[in-house]
Amino acid sequence: MAIPTGAGTEVLKRTSITGLGAGATYADWWHVDWASEEVSSQAASAVVAADHILTIISVIICNQSVSYSFPIDMAVDTASGGNTQFLLYDQDIASKGTFIFNDRFVLHPADALKFRVNKDASGDNTSVYVSFIDQHF
């Protein structure tokens, strides 16, 4: 990875995932697509582009189910490979509830941020909204 030199851009951006879970995809990972404003189906691994560093500012997760709470996992696959690094594991979100993760963290080129609903249920319907700073050098 190149070292930032002072030239380049720093832009505030956002992306989202809608319909996470939806029963059929229980326990399947959905990846954030940094080049898209919204992911509405299970995406293959979408990684941070070369010559970019992303600072995640906040992650807002909303459970749209009217009847059930669901546990959510949030994790990072690092460019160096190895094990999945969990940032949230079985974080329970009440029905019609919202969870806000506002600890900052950094993603480097080839890292991937991913989410999954960690419970088998047909009524899960979760939205994820991610705001971040994209530093391109």
Q: Each predicted region: which residue ranges?
A:
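Short proline/glycine- and polar residue-rich coil/turn motifs
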Residues: 91-97
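Short, surface-exposed beta-strand/strand-loop-strand elements in extracellular ectodomains
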Residues: 66-89
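Extended, low-complexity, turn-rich repeat/linker tracts enriched in Gly/Pro/Ser/Thr and Asp/Glu
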Residues: 62-70, 119-126
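Beta-strand elements of well-folded, non-transmembrane domains
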Residues: 63, 76-78, 132-136
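C-terminal interaction-tip segments
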Residues: 1-52, 117-137
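Noncatalytic modules at the cell exterior or secretory-pathway interfaces
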Residues: 104-122
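Exposed aromatic-hydrophobic patches
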Residues: 98-104
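A short beta-strand element within beta-rich, extracytoplasmic domains
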Residues: 53-64, 115
